[in-house]
Regions:
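N-terminal regulatory/sensing modules of transcriptional regulators
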Residues: 1-18
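Cytosolic nucleotide-binding catalytic cores of signal-transduction proteins
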Residues: 18-92
Length: 92
């Protein structure tokens, strides 16, 4: 076990406001060759929150962890994933 591994409580409310989401998207761009910006250019009607969700889904973050980050239920996150997939597929 890694004593430095984040605990579930460390994720709670991590992405609960737009300011935190903007910082996250800037970090995604920095680490992943402008992934978030490219996604927003490809699908301009994505909100900041939707773009953050897409980035987390792309990173294969567990649904339960994303739920903690946004202070939402796992079923809400699963529904959001399906709606975003439909929105993205409609643009392609």
């Amino acid at each position: 076990d890694n004593p430095h591994a984040p605990q579930p409580k460390d994720y709670t409310n991590l992405m609960s406001d737009a300011g935190q989401q903007v910082i996250f998207l800037k970090e995604m761009d920095y680490c992943f060759n402008n992934f978030a910006t490219g996604l927003q250019q490809l699908i301009p009607d994505l909100t900041i929150e939707e773009t953050a969700y897409c980035c987390l889904f792309h990173l294969n973050i567990r649904t339960s962890d994303i739920a903690e980050m946004f202070s939402r239920s796992k079923s809400t996150i699963s529904s959001r994933r399906k709606r975003l997939e439909a929105k993205i597929n409609a643009k392609n």
